[in-house]
Amino acid sequence: VLSHLDQDHSGAFPLIQQEIPVKQLISNEQLPNDLKQPFQYCHQGQQWHYPELDIQILWPKEKDLAFVASNQNQYSCVVYLQFKKVGGYQNFLIMGDAGWEAEYELLKDYPNLKIDVLVLGHHGSKHSSAYDFLATLKPKLAIASAGFDNRYGHPSQQVIARLKALHIPLKSTVEQGTLSFVLENHKIVLHDRRLDRLWLSRGF
């Protein structure tokens, strides 16, 4: 599943294709034909069930796919993962670049959603992760996926303040580096690893 086709969300897909056999791609917009990949649009209601994992698409609604071209971010595929027969982190909500409108609709459509890990919308932008959304979901952990020294300042100070006020721990790839959830001894745990790499500021 690609949440949408912005480069920072889909750019590595050709490399993934080289390493992992992909039977079908799911996204809110169809990829260029040169990628030669069976495709399906994502929309609310899609579900896939496996012995150890349930996957659901919670957003966008099928009727909203017509508006994706004008607002890719807001109509990102929002994915809900439920791992079964494991301890630790079990329920994951991955927001893509969706913002407040999607959050409001999710709370309306799924009032009893159980979340252990929330991957913040739009890298922790101030226009996502509304206070009421965070307060209702009450995740055990929030994740902000953002590039080091990114020009937007993600995750935003406003979102960081909301999380602190609600006592929701935050892990950020800016601070912790690569974040990986790993199954160990029937329990899903989080590992972080900062690569030994030279970072150049934008001034160079």
Predicted regions and their residues:
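Non-globular, low-confidence helical/coil segments that flank catalytic cores
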Residues: V1-F204
